[in-house]
Amino acid sequence: MVHFTAEEKAAITSTWKLVDVEDAGAEALGRLLVVYPWTQRFFDSFGNLSSSSAIMGNPKVKAHGKKVLTAFGDAVKNVDDLKNTFAHLSELHCDRLHVDPENFKLLGNVLVIVLAKYFGKEFTPQVQSAWQKLVAGVATALAHKYH
């Protein structure tokens, strides 16, 4: 279990309320698919993923990115219970989708980069550290069913 200090929780919640879930989610998932092209195999039904412009403009990537980032909203609300919060998604990604759990870490790291881009100087080392801790906790929770 990951323990968050009051300061870390405040850093996460204060930035999260400013995040455009649709825009940031699309960018995070799109960047994951561009930078780590082997992750595209989990998205065969998404159509054209042949180039970075095709990926970033793909409506299915945008829609799923929003869905993914909406789930991160659940993490923000439940930082003290990530394992139970993501139990269903862990089971889905393990049993049905067969997603390599390492990909959860990759997506988390990409999300932190996207957030840093959006917040600029406001994304202080303390804020970044809190978010890194959260995305690592989410990745661990999503990988739980694999163990």
From Swiss-Prot:
Q: Which residues form the Globin domain?
A: 3-147
Q: Which Pfam families match?
A: Globin
Q: For this UniProt entry, what's an example GO CC term?
A: haptoglobin-hemoglobin complex
- Tissue spec. comment: Red blood cells.
Q: Which domain of life is it from?
A: Eukaryota
Q: PROSITE patterns attached here? A: GLOBIN (PS01033)
Recorded family membership:
Belongs to the globin family.
Q: Which PANTHER family has this protein been placed in?
A: HEMOGLOBIN FAMILY MEMBER, HEMOGLOBIN SUBUNIT EPSILON
What is this protein identified as?
Answer: Hemoglobin subunit gamma
What gene name is listed for this protein? Answer: HBG
